[in-house]
Amino acid sequence: AERRLDLKFVISYDSDIRSARKAVQEIAKKNPYVLPEREITVNVDELADSSVVLVVKFWAKKENYWQARYTMLEDIKYGFDEAGIRIPYPQMDVHLESGT
């Protein structure tokens, strides 16, 4: 039996979406738990407040679900690091007004 995985991850607005999509496609193709005969898609899922949310959808054997999930998440992080694709973290700008 097979199971589809949908993994969401974020990139910064100043990162190139095409480069991120290409990197994730290549990472998925190299992952031994991802079924190569099934379609792998990477799409923009949301334009959030401080990031672009991407989703990768791929298939794995049911018994390899967790290995596929964990290895893909780790490989995406390392792949983004190597490609210079930034994963943003929440931040807040505080503006102080002087009292008059």
Question: Where are the model-predicted features located?
Answer:
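Structured, soluble regulatory/oligomerization domains located on the cytosolic or IMS-facing side
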Residues: 1-100
